[in-house]
Amino acid sequence: MANRRKFSQAGGGGGGGVFDPFGTKQAVSSLRKGGRLPVYVAGVFFVIFVIIMYGEDIRSLTLDPIARAGTTPARIVEPVVTEERHVARVNPPRREVSSAEKAAALPLDVDERPKLATPTPTEAAKEVPKVEKIRKPKKPKTTKKKPRKPRPAKKTVAAAAGGLLGVPETCDLSKGEWVFDNTSYPLYREEQCEFLTSQVTCMRNGRRDDTYQKWRWQPKDCSMPRFDAKLFMERLRGKRFMFVGDSLNRNQWESMVCLVQSAMSPGKKYVTWEDQRVVFHAVEYNATVEFYWAPFLVESNSDDPKIHSIQHRIIKADAIAAHAQNWRGVDYLVFNTYIWWMNTLNMKIMRPGGQSWEEHDEVVRIEAYRKVLTTWASWVNDNIDPARTSVFFMSISPLHISPEVWGNPGGIRCAKETMPLLNWHGPIWLGTDWDMFHAAANVSRTAATRVPITFVDVTTMSERRKDGHTSVHTIRQGKVLTPEQQADPGTYADCIHWCLPGVPDIWNLILYTRIMSRPQLV
């Protein structure tokens, strides 16, 4: 009652009382009799309080079309990231915006496909489109396909069961580009191939970078399949495969042995040496992969594989029978001859009917080369059965001894080169004898009218690979170079031969593609 009296006095009538615009005094007086005063009064004052405090907000709500649509303006306006995060903590529904932020930032953190610490220029140029692909929901399919470049091999295995890989003869495999691929390359590991000689095991001999092993050749107008050792050995079952020529063909022979040996069981593969011939035996397939030493193809005073470093080289330009008797019955013959011609501009040729090497004449190199190739092609045409034997001629393997040509005037031969020449347009003047190149190409295409000869052009693609040579990570006189010798690349760097795994693997992949894309011979 005391409280009621105070309230009544505070709101009482009379001229000195408080102005009562809503007539609350009469309402209180009438309700006092019914005993419901506290509830009624509380309700009235609550309504008054709401109207006074939120009147402006209520009017703005009735006028704001966004509010009528039930959408919060903060969801449309994109503020600074820090403000976004602050609102998200106060208002939980804002977490949707936070997820969108994470999705937009994802490519900056996720795309870690390049495995090397130093990406190549080609990779760097390709990184931007890869990042953009991850931003779009549909693009993960594209990024997943990138590492699976050898997919055509899977498709061609089925086709190969019928004898074909499906790569057309019209596709020029010599034109293309080197693509960095550390997913599917190298095709084998140096330490996994027991048949490599110390001349080509660059990593074992002290080379620190292995980037040279991870470049895939991509032809311009078609694709080559990945090398399938078991598929290839099935084609070679019961057959002989032979490389004939100089040390570059021996380099390629070692590569081929390492490519195929994985298809055989331990103890079912071994190598034998027989005079000028080295033979890899694949016991389970009753097949051999061989190398025959004949640096000029015809007979010469350099035919001893153990003592052939002769300063004055002399050839019998029209004598090939002594060598060729070892080529009879071979199912695949791969020839080459070049590097041994390059120490002089003129070539010494034994005179017809001469009885000793002293009886010789000097002939311009290109003329002697054409004469030897004509002798060789005539033998092929007269002695090879095209229904049984396939014949190939490998083009020139280039040297890299002039670093100023590729923009490294301070370099020493091919030493310390770790990258191919990328995005290079036009010829590279490395000293390659293009007259000899064209002579070999023309003879291969025209001289043997009865037997097809496939000229395998590996010259231009190999000219880009200044990084692939053994350099100072090789042997000299049967021994690995000492640290002192390795520190003198001007004297000891070998810029002729190639590290394995490496460039010759691609040469063999071209051979594999051509062979497996043709019908199997008898």
From Swiss-Prot:
Disulfide bonds join 171-222, 193-258, 202-499, 414-495. It is a single-pass type II membrane protein. The keyword Transferase applies. It is found in: Golgi apparatus membrane. Residues 124-134 have a biased composition (Basic and acidic residues). One of its GO terms (biological process) is xylan acetylation. Residues 111-157 are annotated as: Disordered. The keyword NAD does not apply. Residues 1-37 are cytoplasmic. Xylan acetyltransferase required for 2-O- and 3-O-monoacetylation of xylosyl residues in xylan. Catalyzes the 2-O-acetylation of xylan, followed by nonenzymatic acetyl migration to the O-3 position, resulting in products that are monoacetylated at both O-2 and O-3 positions. A motif (DXXH motif) lies at residues 494-497. Glycans are attached at residues 182, 286, 442. A motif (GDS motif) lies at residues 245-247. The gene is XOAT1. Its main location: Golgi. Its EC number is 2.3.1.-. It is an enzyme of class 2 (transferase). One of its GO terms (molecular function) is xylan O-acetyltransferase activity. The chain crosses the membrane at residues 38-58. It comes from the Eukaryota. This is Xylan O-acetyltransferase 1. Expressed in roots, leaves and inflorescences. GO terms for cellular component: Golgi apparatus; Golgi membrane. Residues 135-154 have a biased composition (Basic residues).
